[in-house]
Amino acid sequence: MGDLDLCRERTRWFPALVSNHVVDMINKYPREQLPEALTGYITDRTGYDYHHHAEVGSSNAAFVGDEVTDRFCVLGSVDDHRRKLAELAEAGVDQFNIYLMNGDEEEQLEIYGREIVPSFLRVSGTA
C-alpha cells in the first residue's frame, strides 16, 4: 500500500504466477473461447522458473507490464484500494484475498482492519 510504482514492483510476481494457470487453460481450451484480456498478456512470457515462484523481484515477472499488474492487483493508496474493491463488489465479487508477502505485511493488515474493511461494513452491513 502506498506509492503506486513501488506497489507494482512488489506485486508484479502475482500476475506472473497466474500466467501458469492461463497457460494451462490455453492448453486445455480453444484460445478463441478464452478472453483476450486474460490470455493476451502472456504472449511475451518465455518460461517460468519455479525456484523463484511467488518471489518479489523475480525475473519470472519481467514480461508483466504495469497495465496487467494494475488489472490483476489492488494497488496504491487506501482510497485506491477502497475504489477498486468497490468496483469488484459491483461486479459481484464477494470475497477478497490479501497476499501478505510483499513487504510491510503487518502495516498492510493493520490499515485494512482500521481503514478499509470498516468502510465496507458500513455499506453492506456485513464483512
Predicted features along the sequence, with ranges:
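Weak global preference for isoleucine
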Residues: 25-26, 42, 98, 111, ...
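C-terminal helical cap(s) of enzyme catalytic domains, especially alpha/beta-barrels
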Residues: 105-126
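An alpha-helical appendage that flanks or caps ligand/catalytic pockets
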Residues: 1-90, 121-126
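Acidic-and-aromatic substrate-binding clefts and catalytic sites of carbohydrate-active enzymes
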Residues: 74, 101-107
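Hydrophobic faces of well-ordered beta-strands that scaffold small-molecule active sites
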Residues: 70, 96-98
